[in-house]
Amino acid sequence: MAATTAALSGATMSTAFAPKTPPMTAALPTNVGRALFGLKSSASRGRVTAMAAYKVTLVTPEGKQELECPDDVYILDAAEEAGIDLPYSCRAGSCSSCAGKVTSGSVNQDDGSFLDDDQIKEGWVLTCVAYPTGDVTIETHKEEELTA
């Protein structure tokens, strides 16, 4: 292999040992802190808070299915990520396609607009806008029962 010489602004440099292609660098995922350490960062001055994950039990027509769901992930999204098929349509809490009934535990579904306060007190939940606030059990596929 013959070495080549390049002149750059009057300086001479040998390229015999220079790699022909630039080295590849692996980019770290942006959520590496959360994934490895159970932490999430806040946009305000680098504060870090602990992230909780709860056990969500879904009672589906196929039977009970359990998954871990972080407190900042919608239950529908966590279920899909775990390979559990749940009904949905709008993904915004403005319809009843993903309706379920909480039989134990609690959720935060402040992002939704379809359910009224009485329905929420009765245990109705829209999984597309519900975050777990503790371990929770939800009966899914309840749209027909809700709208009856």
UniProtKB/Swiss-Prot annotation:
Localization (cell): Plastid, Chloroplast
Protein name: Ferredoxin-1, chloroplastic
NCBIfam families: fdx_plant
Record PROSITE patterns: 2FE2S_FER_1 (PS00197), 2FE2S_FER_2 (PS51085)
Domain 2Fe-2S ferredoxin-type span(s) in chain numbering: 54-144
Keywords for the protein's UniProt record, in alphabetical order: 2Fe-2S, Chloroplast, Electron transport, Iron, Iron-sulfur, Metal-binding, Plastid, Transit peptide, Transport
Free-text remark on how the cofactor is bound: Binds 1 [2Fe-2S] cluster.
Entry similarity comment: Belongs to the 2Fe2S plant-type ferredoxin family.
Residue span of the annotated presequence: 1-51
Cofactor dependency: [2Fe-2S] cluster
Positions that bind [2Fe-2S] cluster: 90, 95, 98, 128
SUPFAM superfamilies: 2Fe-2S ferredoxin-like
A GO biological-process term: electron transport chain
UniProt KW Magnesium keyword: no
Short name of any one Pfam family annotated for the protein: Fer2
SS bond list: none
Domain of life: Eukaryota
GO cellular component, one term: chloroplast stroma
GO molecular function, one term: electron transfer activity
